């Protein structure tokens, strides 16, 4: 298995390169072939323009394509519950529903397919096979049903067998083995021969079909599009078959290798299933084609399949799939295999031709194949009962034998003909391998387990099969998919028998397998992730051999539950059936884990990008290496999504079809959900949430439902807008609460609407996508999209799970995983498919492996943890339907498929439409976001925009969770769309919880692929580059990544503008792209600068993502804790990544400083981020993550704006606006305006100063927003991760204050950069976190106290009244949580001395002394700006466009929080507002101290930047040096203080555990970010302290308290102390860098010394707090001592002795009694002894008697008596006694003796036969009993 895994990994590697080739060349033809010839995928871009043929398939299967969508609707309608339950559950439900519908449709569709079959007759082989088909009419229906059933079974089997395949690639064939072996067992020679022969003919046919398909496909595909690749693949396949024959010649000397190769394919198909998912571009890249074919097949199949299989087939399909498909599908497959293999070969020929001829031929071929399917489906209709009879593997082997005999004869004829045909067809490629495959298949089936298992090692043995397997896996992966699917349907023989069907279904099933894999990947992403997929996969690869039989039986049995769940399966496929599988985890593992493993396979494929699987990692690297592999992944995930849809609805035949269609959206989201689930599983696994099994199950229960429920609840509520967090709680909340919210903004009817719109859209959008993909631009994006987006996204969720999202799999963990997980992930997947997805995908592939593996592990663990079973019950909403609903509802039909940008638009259109729906539901949140974005983008400072934001705020408050989650989801989606387009694709994922993994992968991959993604972004934004180009050219000196990001931003902005809502989309996309661009820029600078941050950032990001996902997964169970974890994760993913991004962006900022236009762009980005931020507040984690990212980027933008625009007014304005918006949300707009003006005046006064001010403002605003959120989720806030992202000029300071008391997992991300002075702004990430934690502790502690009352006031007051707020925040936090206490502790160093002080008092004291002049100047500047930019508007609405832009972000973010927190904050905060307004000068002063502090914070950021910010190389080096100098002072001083302080109070242990571990795990980036975050919490209070301290001794006193926190903080994040020390240590102590350094100087003295002393007090406090706990524990230990004394008391011992004595006595007595009991009486004690003697000797005697009696003259009764006694003389002696006794007590004393004696004596009458029998029986019984 390890070899197999390695081979899987190998296969991915070579599959990555050669398979990429094959994917690009060989497999696109094979994709068509796999796509069922009719997948009709043009493969324009990446062989991905599957839409044409796919649509042709859809058109041809117009009803089916629509039916797929309709089915998705119907199934999704059913699955609405199902998908809510789980991807797998949905998958199973879809399998059942689709099977039921397919069964229902099958009857009508079979007739259609009969007609189609008549069409199919056009195919010579199909005709011949159809001709062969009649000889086996049952098989013909079985074949038809094999096509359908096999399709369904392949869908189900893909789900199962792909699960199994992926779980047990061997098992797929070992299933055949097992079936064949079962047949062997049943018919050891003949049946095995039949099984092997049928299997062999089938295998031969399958393999010839496979090979022939590979030969035909590869030959014809070579003819068609990739002749050499296909030929190479075919030759490789032959090589693998033949060399495999040589290499794997274990028991399969020459032929076994081919089966081994086939097994390798099966195994490697599992591997390839993975590969197919990601690495095997054939089923994956062809996956779109294959899904086309599969979709068409599935269209055919679902129609009859859903109907005919409704009861019988779902089970046969899943469980009955093994059952019915084995029988029916054996017959069917044998029959169908004959027609199908010829049909497929003919389609192969046709496909080759059609590949040449194009989609039309593929469509025709598909149609032909589909008619073949239809015929077999019709024919299979008869067998369904048989299939139903075959629900169990026992039946399967028997029926398989029966069918094998039947099919063997018929299929031998057909297969022989077909094999001859195939051999003739395949002879050029490998006729001998066909025979070898036949023979080998016989041997293989005999030795399938060995062969498969050996083949797995052998597959790993012959690396050349890597090349060979590239083609082989491509073809064979198709076929293996088909085979595995067929095997799943036909278990083994069906797999092989069905392999001709497998060939066609290799095309179809490859598509379907891709679909199923996608489904299975999506579902198994859940299931697999639930199941320890790697464990299961490896085990299952081995176990699959075992489990395949068991899995066939289990699959039959489980599939019977699946079947039972047919209708229930829609709900319980994962839930009930999967729970059954969970119960049958091991057995069902085959089936269930087939789903799981299919998903794992897919997931591993996707987790190739998301190293959810080892092979996933390997393959992930491989897939990462080759874009076609990501296309394979993408296609695989698309295929998975489609394979999954095959089970569900075959929404898009091709992955992109379903990906880009509503189906694609739904499935993209579903896939994202699955990938998120995968990611969640991965995350859970990373968390080690009970290992893969536990986590996978848990993920199935929780995380998978996260994604599923994301889609489910989203689709149910609003697929995209309200992507449910993969969190079980979130899903429950979202499903129940958020779903209600979603219903608020997305009515339950919307799913149908979304769904219904989806179907036409699917064809339209598929066509559009095809066209878009055909478009050159789209070629890049669409191709990448096909490959990378789904796979990467899938990996990220779904992780995957997956990600999947993270890779699609995670990103179940944060709000993004919750809200944006599906939406963001699906859209990331889609958008990945749109923009630069290969790069993103590859970067994901490259970077996520760490993250993804964690994701994979976490997700699988999380899913297992969730068990995927319970959660599925929770989430009954169909995953596809919700996502499809949300996506369809978003009017994605036209928009999403318009092109690459259109795809992004579609995603954004989906998002925007979803957002519009959300806006409809959420009021004008998105419109306001758009207005805000527009205002930001236009920097037209519309007061109305802010007013809208306030309206939005109100609406957000009304729809805080609903709308903002949706908006956040949309922001995520848009973010994802943009990030998909941009390198920031995954960073945007960071923006949301779900996107964490993706964002991590993105962040991880972006630094690697930042340039390429930027290049791709440039491509995607090329049309729009002109917009950015002036500033970019101006900035060209600046970081190219920033340029590329700005390009993408503006281009995406333009694209978005050209999208549905030009402004909405632009704003959204600008927001998203701002995030993405900033992130890519950040990454590019990181990459360029090669800062520690890049590596550390990547590692941290990966670790963080894993930890984040782990947190998410772990925290997901309860929404509150989930929220806290999500927020932490969001902070970590978003905050730390954002810190990374912000640092990079800051570096970019420094570069961008020169270009005002860049600043404008960044303002737009800030606006985007502002808009982005508005979404997040609903989702605490996504809110904070997005907020953090948006704010960080916004700050970053503002920083560059402020720097670049030397007119601080403009650059200040965006920051100001964004931050005041937060404050506005937190408090009243007037206050925001005042502060904004204050900040802006400060900005005018000093850009850097203003920046610090803005940072502080941002800190305050973000803190206010966070407070809002905290207030919104006061309970959550405890467990909340307060992430203060402060972007200073050089640094992004993310202060994560994790109050792990975390009643809720809310993650508050504050962006301090907006509200902090520029100097402070650099520290803003840290300072902001510090502000967030400390101002949150100080300013927000009070606002949190009064947070419900006046959210904005805390922010304002935070800036103006840092200590006062600290007090309030302390109070609030004390009230709220230990986090508040930590905030108190954080603020205690400020508040301890100034607890009762109002912020005014301390700040006035602090500010005047510290930076009185500076603050006065700044105050004048800020007041200028306030006056210039209406102070009222600043508070109420900022009229300045940029300010508006800046405001919008906070406003949106704050809006949620305002709604939540206003009640709490409003009154207190209004008072504080008054104070803040009254003390806006003080705030300026605070900002100035913040500036002073900000420098250190900025230095902290610099350190972080070293960690994460590679962009600010020019600024960073000096700052870094300074930072290092300061780090020396401050790292030991401030960082430790900060690190220890915030977390120790309440966050410290949890936060430390989460953040600290995450920081350490995340490496320096995480450490820097976490440290910065934690320090920033201290840094901001220290800033306040610094301000106060510099100004007043009181502040130093507070600062003294403050440093206390950092040491504790440092203890939390030991590695991060340096960063806080930067903030504490001025950037340039004596070098005032435009007032940034000057304040930093002041901060230095104040911060350095006070933080040390404060750190100790804080640490002491924190330590004291734990120590009292420890003392309490000691008291408990005292109790333990008492316990010890109690035992010493001897009572326990006495009791124990007594008990022991009693027990011993009782036992002895019991033994004696037992003796007497056997004796049957006191008198019979001797008899008992005799019994002993009898037993002892009677055994021998019995044995003797047994031997002798049987042989000892049975005829001679007397002789027997004599002989008996003589033989058992010793016994006869006893026997004499016994006989003597036995007459009286014979029955009692020695029944054995009595029997013998009776036999001997009284039973003498019984003549020798009976006597001998009795003697034998007695002796046997005596021997048994006696022995």
UniProtKB/Swiss-Prot annotation:
Post-translational modification: Phosphorylated at serine residues in K-X-G-S motifs by MAP/microtubule affinity-regulating kinase (MARK1 or MARK2), causing detachment from microtubules, and their disassembly. The interaction with KNDC1 enhances MAP2 threonine phosphorylation.
Biased composition (Basic residues): 1426-1435
Compositional bias per record (Acidic residues), positions renumbered to this chain: 1327-1337
Region entry Interaction with KNDC1, spans: 701-744
PROSITE patterns: TAU_MAP_1, TAU_MAP_2
Biased composition, class Low complexity, residue ranges: 120-133, 1541-1552, 1562-1574, 1587-1603
Composition skew (Basic and acidic residues), residue ranges: 1-11, 109-119, 175-194, 207-221, 364-380, 392-415, 435-467, 596-606, 945-982, 1097-1155, 1354-1376, 1407-1425, 1440-1459, 1522-1539
Keywords (A to Z) from UniProt: Calmodulin-binding, Cell projection, Cytoplasm, Cytoskeleton, Microtubule, Phosphoprotein, Repeat
Residues found modified as Phosphoserine: 136, 140, 143, 285, 498, 601, 605, 610, 629, 725, 729, 736, 738, 821, 881, 890, 936, 1133-1134, 1139, 1155, 1159, 1347, 1353, 1534, 1555, 1588, 1653, 1679, 1782, 1787, 1790, 1795, 1808
GO cellular component: apical distal dendrite; axon hillock; axon initial segment; basal dendrite; cilium; cytoplasm; cytosol; dendrite
Ranges of the Tau/MAP repeats in the UniProt entry: 1661-1691, 1692-1722, 1723-1754
Modification sites for Phosphothreonine: 733, 1154, 1602, 1605, 1616, 1619, 1649
Any one GO BP annotation for this protein: regulation of organelle transport along microtubule
Region listing for Disordered, in residue ranges: 1-88, 109-221, 340-497, 579-660, 931-988, 1073-1160, 1197-1216, 1297-1378, 1403-1460, 1471-1490, 1506-1638, 1779-1801
Biased composition annotated in UniProt, kind: Polar residues: 63-73, 416-430, 1609-1619
InterPro entries, alphabetized: MAP2/MAP4/Tau, MAP2_projctn, MAP_tubulin-bd_rpt
Modified positions (Phosphotyrosine) in chain numbering: 745
Region of interest: Calmodulin-binding: 1447-1467
Role, per record: The exact function of MAP2 is unknown but MAPs may stabilize the microtubules against depolymerization. They also seem to have a stiffening effect on microtubules.
Subunit structure: Interacts with KNDC1 (via KIND2); the interaction enhances MAP2 phosphorylation and localizes KNDC1 to dendrites. Interacts with DPYSL5.
Protein name per UniProt: Microtubule-associated protein 2
Organism, as annotated: Homo sapiens (Human)
Lineage of origin: Eukaryota, Metazoa, Chordata, Craniata, Vertebrata
